[in-house]
Amino acid sequence: SNNELTNEERNLLSVAYKNVVGARRSSWRVISSIEQKTEGSERKQQMAKDYREKIEKELKDICHEVLTLLDKFLIPKATTAESKVFYLKMKGDYYRYLAEVATGDERQKVIEESQRAYNDAFDIAKNQMQPTHPIRLGLALNFSVFYYEILNAPDRACHLAKQAFDDAIAELDTLNEDSYKDSTLIMQLLRDNLTLWTSDTGGDDDANAPDEHQ
């Protein structure tokens, strides 16, 4: 059938996968930092490495499953600007999660895919959605995290986040009653990241992972 998912179904799908992949991303970060601290004990380092690779495989499998769903079914069937942006953002997110664990040529490839999906989503969002729309704001939030964390481009990250925040502030009167809470929450997260990034002196990043949207 040609039926698109409803908003609620779309959100449930997104949250379900976000929880599954989120657990792996957290584990991967923890085990990677443990691995770095075990230099000097070959046995411990090997155990950490084996476990990291196991988590990596699970994380990659989940991401590829989501990306297949998006490319084969969800994106081709999306008819509204809202659903197109939602799914393209999701595609950018899952390639970004792959980029977090990938290395070498593979990393370059997934970074390009992530950036392309975010850019495509951003073009549609800017032309067809209010700056206060939670999906447009969530996209700006995650795209700016991509610039900061994956491309190591803090200036671009801050510019994108600030622009999205300022554009939303300028049109606060367009805030939809139904999505008021979502929109203002994401605006707060954009501000939090800007504060974090403009004060970041390159200390211990683990404690200061930026905020993301589902």
Swiss-Prot record:
Cysteines engaged in disulfide bonds, as pairs: none
InterPro entries recorded: 14-3-3, 14-3-3_CS, 14-3-3_dom_sf, 14-3-3_domain
SMART domains linked to this entry: 14_3_3
Family: Belongs to the 14-3-3 family.
Listed name of the protein: 14-3-3 protein homolog 2
